[in-house]
Amino acid sequence: FGMDMTVISGVEKTIKELWQLDDWTHGFAMATALYGTVIGAAFGGIPADKLGRKKNLFWIGLSFLISSIGAALANDVNSFMIFRFLGGLGIGASSVVAPIYISEIAPAKHRGKLVISFQLNIVLGILIAYVSNYFLNGLGENDWRYMLAIVALPSLLFSILILFTPESPTFLLLHRNDLENAKKILSLVDTEAD
């Protein structure tokens, strides 16, 4: 989600001029994703407990995908804010659900490193956003749309790849009482598990 949060830095001045926003509306529009982030973080764990970590992560990936494409295609500030808010919901939810999923599926000896890699990947996303903004800047009057749309690429990749990962064995045990499948998944991810 680092890329989704940071990419806005390359488009905010253009959007202010394009839609002739006053300072208050401009600030509100730029912060809309943050409002979604708070709500997503507060409530993102609920569907993870009901649907499963994997399904929730899939929907989070789709929210990033829809948000990036929708914001890139927005023709007014209101639709832009709706799509940025949706992306913010995904950011907030992912900040809760992804570390839970990683910690529940990772073998004990690698758990710390893998949970830390989540934060490292956020920072990597921030870097990629700044670099992509740099290279996309100046590509014409729609360069701001390209900057927002580029987030769709990792979002799509994530949404596809999550389909090939197993569900959290902890979720299967605690919420589905499925000991058999939980053991199968544990044997796949941790060959040294008892």
Write out the residue ranges for each language-model feature.
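Transmembrane-helix signature of 12-pass secondary carriers
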Residues: 1-194
